[in-house]
Amino acid sequence: MQPFNGILFCIHGFLGQASDWELTIPLELRWKSIDLFSKEALVPSPLDFRSFGEAIQKNVGDLPCPRVLVGYSLGGRIALHMLVEKPEIWSAAVIIGAHPGLSDEGERLRRIDGDERWAKRFEVEEWDTVLSDWNSQTVLIGSPNIERKESDFSRKTLADSLRGCSLGKQKDLREQIGKLRLPILWIVGEEDLKFLSIAKQLKKLNPRITLVVIPKAGHRAPWDQPEFFKKCLIEFLTINES
């Protein structure tokens, strides 16, 4: 088997930075990412899944093939929207700890309300307090917190993304994911039980999904176990080189 000669385009999660991927991508691989929440970021308007995807797409056009789309958490949800919109420009995808969308209207409304509360907090509250509370959410417990400086972020963009890209406003993409024909590596941490259950359901919908459960890892699986993640990535890309 030949080594992977393409490029990865990586989309970070909420409160993420492009540099986060440096800890998780093997040195021999080429990759690109952009900061979505920095004060210098070119923020689309209105800020939602479609506009985020279109803004990211502008950074993809000149990249060599094969191209592999990688997305973590919120970045994974953005990546899923991009895949169902224009699957033909990607050779494969790696989705990490991402939700395909809610099907229950009551859940949608509750999530929108919850994200609105977080958005207001990120707009006005003391940075260290809201950051600590964010990292104390059940889904993130068990993973080491990554240092985040207020000066590296636009509070307005963070708040706007919580509103515009709320899980409550996301389409339920299960049907479209089931129809995707490109190979997908779906990564989830062993201790991330909610997302592990979701990933198993999606694997049943699409035989092109390769599900990998990273042991001793939570929602931030690639950063909890970077060497294991690198190994999985290399194996997947080598097998699916095209």
Predicted segments — roles?
Residues 2-43:
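Conserved HGGG/HGGXW glycine-rich cap/lid loop of the alpha/beta-hydrolase fold
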Residues 51-67:
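Conserved acidic catalytic loop of the alpha/beta-hydrolase fold
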Residues 71-75, 79:
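Gly/Ala-rich beta-loop-alpha elbow adjacent to hydrolase catalytic centers
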Residues 84, 90-122:
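Flexible "cap/lid" loop of the alpha/beta hydrolase fold
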Residues 146-176:
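Hydrophobic, aromatic-rich cap/lid helix
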Residues 180, 186-188:
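Short beta-strand/loop motif that positions the catalytic acidic residue
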Residues 193-198:
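Conserved alpha/beta-hydrolase "acid-adjacent" motif
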Residues 217-226, 230:
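Catalytic histidine-centered segment of alpha/beta-hydrolase-like enzymes
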